Design a protein with these regions (language model features):
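Claisen-condensing/thiolase-fold acyl-transfer catalytic domains that form or cleave C-C bonds
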Residues: 16-125
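Short, well-ordered amphipathic alpha-helical segments that serve as non-catalytic structural scaffolds
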Residues: 1-8, 74-79
Length: 125
């Protein structure tokens, strides 16, 4: 997200929403801290797909569920319709995901993550 702001020469206010896959409450807090260190604030327009789908209290999803599934569901059911209707004009969609491996988990290794930023626009002024 930070690198996208640099590459696109834009700020968070240039997007209606900055949407992540499924960071959960734990990941969202870390994301905000990392961006704050670089003087970037996305709190007002950030949305996490998993946090929209899951109930943290009843489902114990503090660190997220499935970024791949949450991203696909929210893209087709919420994001694209809001862009098509013109409610949102520009979205930075960052479907976050962990590259899980049973071997590396059993060996106590870290879990690598991936996130590709996709800039989506409604095409409407």
């Amino acid at each position: 997200i930070y690198q996208s702001f640099i590459d696109f020469e834009m700020e968070s206010v240039d997007f209606d929403r900055i949407i992540t896959g499924d960071l959960g409450a734990v990941g969202q807090k870390l994301l905000f801290e990392l961006l704050d260190e670089n003087h970037k604030d996305i709190k007002k327009n950030h949305m996490d797909c998993g946090m929209q789908i899951f109930d943290e209290e009843s489902q114990d999803t503090h660190a997220g569920g499935s970024g791949c599934a949450c991203s696909a569901l929210m893209l087709s059911a919420v994001i694209l319709p809001k862009l098509a209707s013109g409610e949102w004009k520009r979205v930075l969609f960052v479907p976050t995901g962990a590259l899980l491996s049973q071997v590396s988990a059993n060996e106590g290794r870290t879990i690598p993550a991936i996130a590709h930023a996709v800039w989506l626009e409604s095409g409407q002024e």
